[in-house]
């Protein structure tokens, strides 16, 4: 990260990383899925916390207590929000504040240009909820998109 995290942000990153590792372990052992979420008050730096977490997952991370997690360069993240403007703001902040993400690793999913059957490994996809509604173009078949097998 290009910025130093405040102690409560560091703690949030570690707590989230532990929760994600536990969720992945539960999925692998039992096939059980679960949601891991970040909740914090306005101005607490949720985007910075999430950016540090994502950067740490891609590149590996260790903590002062000796806890360490291997890199997961093929992880896929979907950044979901209600508005395209908020997605753009979040994407720009992540690109500005992280130091280890590659150029092009952050991808905005738009109805006009997105044409993939599956998301590619190692990317952060920014998507707003309207695009995946029942009437959204991303959830319907068309003459140019048919990924049924």
Question: Where are these predicted regions, by residue range?
Answer:
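RecA-like P-loop NTPase motor core of helicase/translocase proteins
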Residues: 1-149
